[in-house]
Amino acid sequence: MPDEAFMPHPVVPKRAGATPHTSIIPPFPCATLRAIPYCLEFAMRRELAIEFSRVTESAALAGYKWLGRGDKNTADGAAVNAMRIMLNQVNIDGTIVIGEGEIDEAPMLYIGEKVGTGRGDAVDIAVDPIEGTRMTAMGQANALAVLAVGDKGCFLNAPDMYMEKLIVGPGAKGTIDLNLPLADNLRNVAAALGKPLSELTVTILAKPRHDAVIAEMQQLGVRVFAIPDGDVAASILTCMPDSEVDVLYGIGGAPEGVVSAAVIRALDGDMNGRLLARHDVKGDNEENRRIGEQELARCKAMGIEAGKVLRLGDMARSDNVIFSATGITKGDLLEGISRKGNIATTETLLIRGKSRTIRRIQSIHYLDRKDPEMQVLIL
C-alpha cells in the first residue's frame, strides 16, 4: 500500500454544517468498508457480555446480604431488584421470557417485562436471580445468580412447571434420547465417551421422586452424585473440561431447564427435555391435579405439547447467546462471595456462545462506592 494511504484524511461528521476533522484511519478498500458494520456489531456484543456480568454480580451481592438468615423470599426479592436495576442500565431492547412468573404473580422481572434502555439490540432474556434460594437462606453451597441472553425468539417460552432433563457434554453429543429407557441412554453415553458404566458419573437432585432412579443407576454400577438443589450449575459441569460430571438427569424446574439449554448450546453439549404436569411428578391428589391442569392449559395456549421430548434446538434455537453466572455461596462451579467490611469479592462465569469463549472473572467491589439505589440492597 502506498505511503499516502496512511496520511491523515478528512472525515465528514454527521452533524450538518460541521467542518471536516482529521483522522489517522487509512482509507479502507470497499470490501473492508462493507465488513465494518459486522465488526462494530461484534465489538458491541463483547461489551454487552461484560455488562451482563455486572448484572449477575449485583444480584449475587444483594442475595448475599441475606445469606444464612432463613428468609429465602427476601433474599430472592433483593436479587430481583438488583438485577432489574442493572438490566435497565444496559443499552438493549430486552424482553424477559423466563423470569419470576407471570405479570400477575411477580412485580418485577415477570415474563414479558421490557428491560434495558430501549436502545440497541432486541434480545430475549432468561433470568434466575437466585438459583438456590433455599441454599442462600440456609448458607449452603452452590447458590448462583444466573442470566442468559439470546436473539429475539431464541428461547423456549416454557411455563413454570416441571421438566425432565437429560444433559451431556460435547463428547456425548447426539447420543441421548428421552424416548429411550434411562439405562440405554447411560450405556450410549458411556460408549461415546469410551468408558465403562462403572466410570460414568451422573448428577441428580436428591429428591424423593428420584429415589428409585438413583437406586437403578447405582445397580448399573454408575457413580451418582445426589445434590440438594441447583441443577443449572450441575448441568454446566457436564460441559466443563476439568469436571468429572458426565451426565445430568432428573426432574426439576422448566425455567431452569431453558437457562441450562442456553448454556449447553453455547458450550456445544446436548440436552433433551420433557415438560411434566405437577400431578405426574408430585402425586395425583386434588390440589396437584388442579395445578397440573392449569399447567397443561398454559402449555396448550403457548403451542407447546407437554410430555413430548424437546431437543436442544427446541429450547435454545441459536448458539448466539451470552450466559453469566456469579457465585453467591462456594460451590462446584464457582467460588462464593467473601466480604470484609465494605469490600466484597465475586467470581463470575461468563460464556459467549458464538465464539465459545469461557471467562472466569474475579472482581473486587467497594460496596460503598456503588450507586445509592444499589447500596440500599447490598449494604
Predicted regions and their residues:
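Oxyanion/phosphate-interacting regions
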Residues: 40-41, 48, 237-379
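DPxDG-like acidic metal-binding loop motif
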Residues: 120-131, 135-154
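Acidic beta-strand-loop-alpha-helix segment within the catalytic core
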Residues: 146, 151-226, 319, 331-333, ...
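Intrinsic disorder/low-complexity segments
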Residues: 1-40
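N-terminal subdomain of lithium-sensitive/metallo-dependent phosphomonoesterases centered on the IMPase/IPPase/PAP
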Residues: 39-126, 187, 191, 218, ...
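General beta-strand structural signal in soluble alpha/beta enzymes
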Residues: 96-100, 125-127, 136-138, 157-158, ...
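Short acidic, glycine/serine/threonine-rich loops at helix termini
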Residues: 108-110, 138-140, 158-161, 212-218, ...
